[in-house]
UniProtKB/Swiss-Prot annotation:
One MF annotation (Gene Ontology) recorded for this entry: DNA binding
E.C. numbers: 6.5.1.2
Descriptive protein name: DNA ligase
GO biological process: DNA repair; DNA replication
Organism: Photorhabdus laumondii subsp. laumondii (strain DSM 15139 / CIP 105565 / TT01) (Photorhabdus luminescens subsp. laumondii)
Amino acid sequence: MKSTAQQIEKLRTTLRHHEYLYHVMDAPEIPDAEYDRLMQELQDLEEQYPELITSDSPTQRIGAAPLAAFEQVRHEIPMLSLDNVFDEESYLAFDKRVRDRLKETQDLVVCCELKLDGLAVSLLYENGELVRAATRGDGTTGENITSNIRTIGAIPLRLFGENIPARIEIRGEVFMPQKGFEKLNEEARRTGAKVFANPRNAAAGSLRQLDPRITAKRPLAFFCYGVGILEGGELPASHYERLIQFKKWGLPVSDKVKVCTDSQQVIDFYHDIVNQRSALGFDIDGVVVKINSLELQEILGFVARAPRWATAFKFPAQEQMTIVRDVEFQVGRTGAITPVARLEPVQVSGVIVSNATLHNADEIERLGLRIGDTVIIRRAGDVIPQVVGVLEERRPQDSNVVVFPEHCPVCGADIERIEGEAVARCTGGLVCGAQRKEALRHFVSRRAMDVDGMGEKIIDQLVDKEYVKTPADLFRLTAGKLTGLDRMGPKSAQNVVDALEKAKKTTFARFLYALGIREVGEATAANLAAHFGELDKLRSADEEALKEVQDVGEVVAKHVVNFFIEPHNQTVIDDLIDDIGINWEPVVVTRAEKIDSPFSGKTVVLTGSLHQLSRDEAKAKLVALGAKVTGSVSKKTDLVIAGEAAGSKLAKANELNIPVIDEEEMIRLLGE
């Protein structure tokens, strides 16, 4: 048995080596037939000795049973998108913004890569073995596609080499090469199956197959470009060196990567890739530019849902002329009011375009656009059509000025536009039909009202069936009504009803956060709760009173005032408090700037399990004593409070030499 086990392991090592040469190095040493012979030999031995089969064996890429549905995966570190630039002037502006923020007068060292047109995925390796794969999803929550990812030959089931971290999350793009895409569509036409519009759709559809045997037949490829979770190990201090390290571990990395030391080199690389684009063999839609130094990346940080240290330098899109027949106003899921031009249909980049975004009122004014104008349409990033110019010399005499509405076209609430902000927004967040699903998802989320079992698909059904229109309606649901939803039995329905009842007892800070007031995150909600103590006092506060609160500036103050003066929102809040009975323990009113405590002015991170206080209670007490409680450890963190089973945050704190105390010490300091 020992010699058989050794023979099996030798075959696995040999096969992994040849997979690496084929997929990563693009330099196979043996014919496909010899690889197939070795694989068959391993399969035969594993059939004889099934007790010797391991999950990372090359034979185990396929074999999982079809799924009923994909389970949700919450990304421990969000998978953010990138901001875009579309021309040299915009890129130089990005370069200047970065240098200004870093107070650098010289050009920065950056790493340029291809922007692949595929599907972003997360690969989690533990002790070198692939244990989970997930889609990007909305950046916070994706889908578990482990069984499908295992079928892609380019993705190693086990990393090899030296210095592999105990836990590392590799991020990259799954895509379908053009030859494989064409062959797939040829076969689809022959059999009468669905024909895919483009390689990206084909890749996405292939990864979302419930049966991994179907995915295994699709010609998918993969390149990695970054890392998320990193525990129990170290990586090089530059992005480029990290890519080299990934390749050493057996992960495929594009060979179209260049380190540039000035902005002109970046622009030259961009034009080189534009010229090579058609010969690459797979779709790309631009070049990604990243600050090479990880230290500088950390200093630059993030804005909204994108890093400040990277941008996507997109390719120019094809343009066409057409006529604007009308302008309508759409309401997005976050309340953004977007003007949309209704166009005389025209073909752009092979697609018939009849609508185009106008972004906002400023853009309409900048363009000088009127209804009836002849305009130039571009498919920005090859995806979203937009108006980029107006041919005023073709303007008809009966053209009409575009009038921006004062009230939401969906719910009738006031439209808010803060000075200095381009986007106008509906203020009826708690009642607006266009925002309903997003508002309800946020309201029941773990960090808000924390309604266990109330997932995204349940919210979708409740809204689609018109069972729920406002957050208060959730608490009026019965087990009988919930049982009528898909995949909701009597026991599950009762559990949701019980969870809703439990959620009525909350904290002032959680309730404020759950309302979804623009720019009011967890920390700001906690500061508002600690400062005002009572909901009525907060509702009646003016901008000047709000600006006295820690971390509340003019913009946030305006959002809060506008939210609470909107009559529709007032009705829903009164309903939640007076009729539903949402309640919380009285809050001790504090003024953080006047407090003399060990935590005053400190940025604090909580990690691990606490036993004497709940996490909410600990946060509230810390905020009340002037602390700013955040969710991640960085160089700006002043103190980490580590409970039981603290993990990566504690490790990072130790790495950065940030002071760490335990729960007992926190309790002692809270009493001072």
